[in-house]
């Protein structure tokens, strides 16, 4: 499984949920439908559906995507509160939807994905921010997440 591509797809789907105000189960259903189409005779280009360089979905950890999207949706209020504790002079609703999605995924991983080291989560979050947001956002996200893991309360 390719964790980097999996996280990237998860971020794109979480962004889609925020922009379209869709529920996780709708997004997951659409994803599974696209996987079935890719495996069947109606082969679609996953790159066309989910963006450049996604390749096919056989290297994506679909269980992770489903677990994280549902987990973020279920725990969104708690995640928002947790993230806002570390936003100095900012509110979560002022951040871009991309930055917000990246922070939610990483915070969810800190709290619920015991097999993922915190530093790996942070590095992947920074790379996503560099690719989909800005260098400034990457530094900002690094600072927020770095402060989070310094706080004993957030640690697993």
From Swiss-Prot:
GO terms for cellular component: cytosol. SUPFAM superfamilies: NusB-like (SSF48013). Keywords: RNA-binding, Transcription, Transcription antitermination, Transcription regulation. It holds the Pfam family NusB. Coiled coil: none annotated. GO terms for molecular function: RNA binding. GO terms for biological process: DNA-templated transcription termination; transcription antitermination. InterPro entries: NusB-like_sf (IPR035926), NusB_fam (IPR011605), NusB_RsmB_TIM44 (IPR006027). Belongs to the NusB family. Involved in transcription antitermination. Required for transcription of ribosomal RNA (rRNA) genes. Binds specifically to the boxA antiterminator sequence of the ribosomal RNA (rrn) operons. PANTHER family: ANTITERMINATION NUSB DOMAIN-CONTAINING PROTEIN (PTHR11078:SF3), N UTILIZATION SUBSTANCE PROTEIN B-RELATED (PTHR11078). This is Transcription antitermination protein NusB. It comes from Clostridium kluyveri (strain ATCC 8527 / DSM 555 / NBRC 12016 / NCIMB 10680 / K1).
């Amino acid at each position: 499984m390719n964790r980097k591509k999996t996280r990237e797809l998860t971020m794109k789907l979480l962004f889609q949920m925020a922009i379209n105000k869709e529920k996780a189960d709708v997004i997951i259903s659409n994803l599974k439908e696209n996987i079935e189409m890719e495996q069947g005779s109606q082969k679609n280009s996953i790159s066309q559906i989910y963006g450049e360089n996604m390749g096919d979905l056989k290297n994506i950890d679909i269980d992770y995507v489903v677990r994280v999207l549902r987990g973020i949706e279920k725990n969104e209020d708690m995640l928002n509160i947790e993230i806002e504790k570390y936003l100095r002079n900012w509110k979560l609703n002022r951040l871009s939807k991309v930055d917000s999605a990246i922070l939610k995924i990483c915070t969810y991983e800190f709290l619920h994905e015991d097999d993922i080291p915190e530093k790996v989560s942070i590095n992947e979050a920074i790379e996503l921010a560099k690719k989909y947001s800005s260098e400034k956002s990457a530094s900002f996200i690094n600072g927020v997440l770095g402060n989070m893991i310094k706080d004993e309360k957030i640690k697993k």
